[in-house]
A protein has these predicted regions:
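Flexible beta->alpha loop and helix N-cap segments adjacent to enzyme active/binding sites
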Residues: 1-227
Length: 227
């Protein structure tokens, strides 16, 4: 992890040939935004404003669907916080809204939750899992208040975060936890059907303006739809 698929075979072969002398964390060593130098231009065009995590959490608690863009992208097929769409999984029809009006994909496709590592046991049966940071396992959901991330068999493909592994996600959860009894958020990759996970601000804003996503947050700047 976080890149357990055929596309990472060459990297695995390299590590097998020459074992690293220390642990190498490649989670967020993917592509930078190719138009990062134009961020201020987009801020001016959209009238974007900078928010703190409390304000972002309030939008999510209010039922808004928010795209998040921070730093370089993730390595591998999992969106682990730097290229993510997040929303409140306590809302019963959120899965259907995302599939039909944002991701444009089949109705049955599931979504993943993320929560703080130290709180995961409250909502998920994590007893038999050593590492849940990479959305690689599906523990059983222990509560019935998370319909939008619970699979038909009662499991969910969980990602846990710490302040060290993803400070933005962790702070967002801290603030969301002050607003909700169930401190879990829904996370899905920031792309729409037929497109890869985004690699530019232009891609992020295209998705915003061509789906029913409500907002995009880029490095804590809030972008709304162009009027």
């Amino acid at each position: 992890p976080p890149n357990p698929h055929d596309g990472s075979l060459s990297l695995g072969h390299m590590f097998l040939y020459k074992k690293p002398t220390k642990q190498v964390d490649i989670t967020y060593k993917g592509l930078p935004l190719v138009d990062r130098n134009k961020l201020q231009d987009y801020i001016d065009e959209y009238g974007a404003t900078k928010l703190n995590k409390r304000e972002i959490a309030e939008l999510i608690k209010d039922g808004k669907i928010v795209g998040l863009v921070y730093g370089d992208s993730e390595v591998g097929p999992r969106a682990l916080g730097n290229r993510s769409i997040v929303c409140d999984p306590n809302i019963a029809d959120m899965k259907d809204i995302l599939n039909s009006k944002v991701k444009f994909r089949e109705w049955y496709r599931p979504f993943a939750p993320f929560c703080k590592k130290e709180e995961a046991h409250k909502w998920f049966d994590t007893r038999n899992f050593d590492n849940l940071e990479y959305m690689s396992y599906a523990p059983r959901v222990k509560v019935d208040t998370l319909p939008s991330i619970t699979h038909e068999d009662g499991t969910a493909r969980l990602q846990v975060v710490t302040e060290e592994s993803h400070s933005h996600f962790y702070e967002l959860l801290t603030e969301f936890g002050k607003l909700s009894e169930t401190n879990v958020l829904l996370n899905t990759s920031f792309n729409i059907r037929g497109y890869p996970i985004l690699s530019s601000i232009k891609d992020a804003l295209y998705a915003l303006n061509n789906t029913e996503m409500d907002y995009v947050v880029i490095e804590d700047y809030l972008f709304g739809k162009l009027k």
